[in-house]
Amino acid sequence: VELIDGLLELLERDPDFQSFTLDGQTAALEDYLAIRPHNRARIEKLVRAGRLEIGPWFVLPDAFLPSGEALIRNLRRGLARSRELGANPRDGYMPDSFGHIAQMPLILRGLGLRSFLFMRGLSKEQWERLGCEFRWRASDGSEVTTIYLRDGYLDSAALGHPEQFGDFEGHEPKPELAVERLRASLKAREGKLHSGAAILFNGCDHMPFQPELPRLLAGAQAAMPEVELVHATIAGYIDHVESSGAKLALHEGELLGNEHNPILSSVWSTRTYLKLANHRAQWLLERVAEPLTVAAGARGRELAALLDEAWRLLLLNHPHDDICGCSIDAVHLDDEARFREVEQIATSVADECVRELARKAGVRRDGSTQWLCALRTS
């Protein structure tokens, strides 16, 4: 809450601080507005001006552990929340998930997105062949412009400081260190920037924004006249790539390489109780409760709002550090509680729908006949 408070003040106070990207997800804004509902208009104004970039996801999920339906619901919810606040996201920012499924371009294009930005999943062979920018095609032919974040989403974090993350409060950034970092980032991408532009990220997990960024960029620009430094947005960068006329190589299939950033595949089997609870929760929602609400007609439609809340709770368990079981115990205790709530809601809705269907079928208790109502939902 304090971070977004300060961010709104900075963006309103300093027009030279061009923009801020809020991590590709909207769940944090839901939490913020629950505490600061009076700031909604301020957020909407900055979003519409293109200075606060939000979405497209509700949360940044793992790509393999949630079901395909859950990934779609996640993106749909994030897009809806973004549009409510004045945004129209077109770029699939998913920086830190541990590898990516082959059908991600299909999901993105199906919901109107044009690009995908990622950090983990490129192999050495793919790096040599594809570089930082390429086209990614799903099995149905859907394609997205795809951007590989070679040094992750923190390559320019804590710019001007000796490390990329840490507590630098009270420490003045040094312009020469900013120049050194920027030069190193560009050198690492030599020969791999087909559009002629690199995207670098000034941020990291749990790191505050840098109010002095415009001053650091101005100083670096003076020291690096051979390049043009722009404080930009993801959308602006993708506009440049797609209008550059660069011929981009094509990739088909999963992204599961480990060349610069490991996919940490062992997380797919850590805390297996979470994986089992997730599978059951998804099955109850997708295969049992939702089909029954359709069959139950008007009564089912009355119950649909309960399932929307169940989906919200389930999606809050799908950030990669949650569902992958690689966070602290306190986080996963919350995950367990949400899974229980999802199961309770889904089973209650399913039970009520079965009762409604039995009533419609004329099932009556007459003391001499036992009725068995069997329903196949998947």
Segments (PLM) and residue ranges:
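Catalytic-domain carbohydrate-binding cleft regions of carbohydrate-active enzymes
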Residues: 1-377
